[in-house]
Design a protein with these regions (language model features):
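Solvent-exposed loop/turn and edge beta-strand elements of beta-rich ligand-binding domains
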Residues: 1-460
């Protein structure tokens, strides 16, 4: 008859022989030997790199390993494809695993040693022990290979965050505007490629250390969610929008926290960190109004001419250089308390636009006016400094003498009676009297000449 022969136990290090059949017929009673061939136990090694916290595969290469056999010898494998080389270090691919190019022989207590961790992770604390035995071998039926799989988990490196907060034009300053922005450039280091993070930030007042609140009493916050791809630069930006109109002279500090999922993994909350700090400037202006005409003895007197000018010399400090500002000058009637209207019934105002190179400086604003009907009036220059249409400083003191000029008629010279008892060097004769005497002398001479001429003509 026909029999199936099945091996139920094999020697150490070899596989069970596959089943085979034998035909037993009528014999002469002699035994016939059967030859059984046992293949040695071998398998490829497949190592998968995972995150030790969540068990997810780390989906990029860079993890490097060495393999040591049960006798403590480093495993090397010689290959000819794609090039001839001897491999002693095995590296994970971009899918987070590697398979040895050649099989490993039967053995217990192989050691897998990580010599370089993937980006964002720490090296394994200890080698991983694995066996190449029939009990540990898996079969990949699709590729018809046998392998031993080892899952190698790494702990993530603790990430860090640092930042540089900036205001206008990448400076460290803000203008006290109703709406302005702070840009926070955050550097995230040791984040895990492939993982998703969120940077959250809020603003604090340096003077109190307390959170800066908006008009609704809520924290002023910003956030940015990003995925740390393989080529992630580590840089993200957040923008905070705030009302700084009442914060002139204050310092604002940005605090950041880095989350991976719901877990806080890093923070930067140093109230003394200058890199995280932006200052709100406190612009100030002072003025000195004067007659714009040249050669005037008293600069605070403006004559009642139809074409008069008043120059307001404005000094400023606390500006952010490189920005364009506008100065508006309104001439105010001190008595009326309103903008002065000249003889042409025009309100007298003037503007000048300038871009300072330094935080402090000066600029002139010239007001042209018809002052022919303004004699006796006092005018005060009111100044408003604005940026992008929003007032940031002003000087409007109706009683400020430096801002004040007086309109007067030009002086007229007239004949004066001689003074009694003139002193030495004083003839008592005014300049007009001298001119009058000269005119009389010339006229008398002319009349005498004409009389003599007529008399001579008559005799002839």
């Amino acid at each position: 008859g026909t029999y199936v022969v099945r091996q139920t136990k094999a020697a150490t290090g070899v596989k069970l022989a596959p089943d085979f059949t034998v035909l037993v017929g009528e014999t002469d009673g002699e035994d016939k030997p059967l030859i059984v061939h046992n293949e040695p136990v071998t398998a490829y090694l497949r190592v998968v790199k995972v995150d030790a916290d969540d068990g997810e595969v780390i989906p990029w290469g860079g993890a490097k390993f060495e393999i040591y056999d049960p006798d403590g010898n480093k495993v090397t494998q010689k290959v000819t494809y794609p090039k001839a080389e001897t491999i002693s270090v095995f590296e994970t691919n971009d899918e987070g695993y590697f398979i040895t190019p050649l099989v490993l022989p039967y053995g217990e207590h192989y050691r897998l040693v990580e010599i370089e961790a993937p980006k964002g992770y720490k090296l394994m604390d200890a080698p991983l022990i694995f066996d190449v035995t029939p009990e540990t071998i898996k079969v990949d039926t699709e590729n018809n290979i046998e392998y031993v799989e080892v899952i190698a988990g790494d702990k993530a490196v603790q990430p860090t965050v640092d930042s540089m907060a900036t205001g206008v034009n990448d400076s460290k300053e803000l203008l006290p505007l109703k709406e302005t922005t702070i840009t926070d450039k955050v550097d995230c280091t040791d984040v895990i490629p492939g993982k998703t993070y969120t940077v959250k930030g809020h603003l604090r007042l340096y003077s109190t250390g307390e959170p800066l609140l908006d008009k609704n009493g809520e924290r002023i916050t910003a956030s940015k969610t990003f995925k740390a791809d393989k080529d992630f630069s580590g840089h993200v930006e957040m923008t905070f929008t705030l009302d700084a109109s009442n914060l002139a002279g204050e310092k604002i500090v940005v605090f950041q926290e880095l989350y991976r999922g719901e877990n806080l993994v890093a923070s930067h909350t140093d109230i003394e960190d200058a890199d995280q700090t932006v200052s709100v400037v406190a612009p100030e202006i002072k003025t000195f109004a004067k007659n714009g005409a040249e050669g005037t003895k008293d600069s605070k007197i403006v004559y009642s001419d139809s074409k008069a000018s008043i120059v307001d010399a404005v000094s400023y400090n606390g500006l952010i250089p490189g920005l364009e500002y506008t100065l508006l000058c309104n001439l105010m009637d001190v008595e009326a308390g309103e903008i002065f209207k000249d003889a042409d019934d025009k309100e007298v105002t003037a503007t000048v636009t300038f871009t300072p190179e330094a935080a402090e400086g000066a600029v002139d604003v010239t007001c042209e006016l018809n002052a022919s009907k303004a004699a006796g009036k006092k005018l005060v220059a009111f100044e408003t400094l604005s940026y992008d249409g929003e007032e940031i400083a002003s000087h409007k003191d109706i009683e400020d003498e430096d801002q004040t000029v007086e309109i007067k008629n030009r002086p007229r010279y007239s004949h004066e009676e001689p003074k009694d008892n003139p002193t030495t060097g004083d003839t008592g004769i005014g300049p007009w009297a001298v001119l009058f005497a000269a005119a009389v002398f010339v006229t008398s001479g002319f009349l005498m000449f004409s009389y003599r001429r007529r008399k001579k003509d008559t005799i002839q």
